[in-house]
Amino acid sequence: RGEYKLVWSDDFEGTSLNADNWNIEIGGGGWGNQELQYYTSREENLKVADGNLIITVKKEAYENRNYTSARITTKNKRDFTYGKMEARIKLPKGGDTWPAFWMLGYGSWPYCGEIDIMEHVGNNPNMTSFALHTSTANGSKGNNWHSQPTTEGIENDFHIFGVEWICNDQFGRDIIYFTIDGERLASKMQPNNIVDKRNWPFFSPYYIILNVAMGGTMGGKINDAIFEQAEPVQMLVDWVRVYQY
């Protein structure tokens, strides 16, 4: 296969989000997970500064919601089929925060497929969640594949979260490895050699999403005391990189 080559990256330099790479999603309808935040494009919630993308969660009444945050995607701008996708991220702290670095295919969910490279919940601070969602096994059915390794102090520093999404790795099947700081901690192989998008849709273009949700089906109970601390409730992203053979 040779070596991985960098094919796309965003280092979040400068003072604004690169519109060639990213869309800013706006809204507060719960996003299918009973989430409690409203995503805005305001600088209070989303900015690029000091070499980082900064998503800040605020407790405030806004558009019939009590929290604001931000969500960005590369939909219809940058998408990829196979490769190594990584982001260097410092997670927010606090009960109910639900940061995520993930990918979606095009079309309707769950048929399009979903790759959750990193999800974290402040109510379980040492846990990172990796997951896949397909038409036959997804979060709505409660039967999707997932793995939740424990990493002490994962919230305290920047870490590199990633996947290696490999075509025909073994036995003619695709495989997706999930990594933290370059270490493979979990993997899921295509169930069989049959191309069936219902149980393995991961052979088409996927786009990247970065967001911080609040509460909802995974985030859990909100602890408003986190908003009274000196440290803001925010996720920092130093860079996002995609490598391919």
Language-model-detected regions and their locations in the chain:
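GH16 jelly-roll
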Residues: 1-245
